[in-house]
């Protein structure tokens, strides 16, 4: 039976994906959000899903309400209205925990690599059997006859605790979200609690010291490059066309694989997917075939060429992610200068990881920094500025503004890697406009 869903904060990555999924399952879906453009809204608009400004008038008692986690009674008129009139609503993660019970569910958790791995697992599985999925880049798909459900499992504020998947991958554990987690031990405890809720099998990166401590009532399979793991990637060849490798399980090769993706981390992501699908009983020849056609996810090493200039857009906003992204750029473009344009995301993360950010950015040949993008949850107390990061980077590092990105033109034979979780795409757009204008002026 069709329902009407109203999403409070529909432009959020998870919310927009869930809205698309429910829409494709035949439900009526609408939502509200701020006017500012987010990359997630294009998919919503293409699907014909109405996006409204926040207003009490959007809500009626016959709707099922799903509210984004950032929206509360004191900062959102719709949440306040629902509470005042005792209209029930669920948070995204609460709704998802109930929704997935009707499927064989496969979760992907981890400090880094969740979205890429969820995208890869969804891509391969949907080509073998009817599958619904939610990806953290705002992509959602609802198959009417789906038996399987693939989803991204987010650790922030322990949002993954309502989830009890049959299978789950955990890519890694790292200290992030210092506005919530008190330290690495706190992060570990959250993931360990989640692991205890997995029912059939857990797949974890075996060379992560923290993950080796994880416990679960479900069997734990370790994957990685070392022979101490249950699933081992070996005979690895990294080229400008992607990565080729074999995987063995208990000493026996189970297949040869190619992923059209770059960087050591993407070999690990693919190995996790292979391990999960092997244990779930899928044909490895089919898995290998469908891995070859994976085209990536939004804002994860997304490439374009403007005026013969290569531009890469990536969501990397943690030192570990920056290193992985720059490693991928070097693999694909070994003979080009790698230029990093990075915008730190949140003051708390920048303060907590300042030296780690500097170390990560040293992997580029030159570095340009945008002013710190503060979260809506925090206030700039002046404790840290982007110039503090620039001073710590050993490579040439300059601070740029969105109104003047012309210093980026000082490089020949370069690849420009824009990274960040704030509004770094505004800087990218400014650079693209600058390149386009140069083309016009030269004609």
UniProtKB/Swiss-Prot annotation:
GO terms for cellular component: cytoplasm. Its main location: cytoplasm. ATP binds at residues 110-116. InterPro entries: Mur-like_cat_sf, Mur_ligase_C, Mur_ligase_C_dom_sf, Mur_ligase_cen, Mur_ligase_N, MurCDEF_pg_biosynth, UDP-N-AcMur_Ala_ligase_MurC. Gene3D superfamilies: Mur ligase, C-terminal domain, Mur-like, catalytic domain, NAD(P)-binding Rossmann-like Domain. Belongs to the MurCDEF family. This is UDP-N-acetylmuramate--L-alanine ligase. It comes from Streptococcus equi subsp. zooepidemicus (strain MGCS10565). The gene is murC.
